[in-house]
Amino acid sequence: LARRRFLQGALATGLLPLPSAKAAASPRIATLDYGLANTLLSLGVTPIAVAAAEGWSDWVVEPPLPSEVVDLGVDREINLELLAALSPDLILTTPYVQSLRSRLEEIAPVLSFSVYNENKRPFRQAQEATLRLAERLGREAEGRALLDRAETLFAALSVRLHVSDPGPLLLVRFMDARHVRVYGGGSLFQDVMDRLGLRNAWEGPATLWGFETVGVEQLAPAAGPETEIFTFEPVPQEVLPTLGNSPLWRRLPAVEAGNF
């Protein structure tokens, strides 16, 4: 159990912000992306508004989103009137909401960041985005310090993982009781695993975003008895009560071995 918790923490290293820089006077920034909001907080900047802020405690958890941050609503259906009323100096987005860009530009300048592309190196893209955002905010030193702390942490975790020598990992998110999203090449998780010397059991196809949605039974070739399966929260409410009775799930060798 202790090793499992350590592995979970190691995987989260590339996804969660490190300790934030000291807050200082900053522009009023709204963001339509959790990752960009995380980066702002790590740079010592609290956004004035975030899309889907209500779901932050389920999908992000740490760090907690300050209570004063305004919820703009679901990312593709954000409350544009509310956003305009907040008078932001800058709006941060991703290509995922490109269809809104022209309307957003009527409110404030827009800065868009892309982490997932054909290069399939999202961690490197995230590093570059961090430095680009830090430069825009006049926080270059904070941006470089953030990346330096991350590299130091990766190095320390790699040493510990080399000693424990964990087996292959299978990273999944349940979509419903019969289907999962499994993460492979091109995902941020894969980049983190590569840096830590961890092995991904999934060698199947993956989308541009580094995952593939498959039936539970399709996990079997990757879910050998030596594989540990990690599931990400939140798990749909209807899944947990039925999972123990699912023959598709219970017959996976990794599940039979108790590696779940």
Placement of each model-derived feature along the sequence:
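An N-terminal domain-start capping segment
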Residues: F6, R76-L83, R136-L147
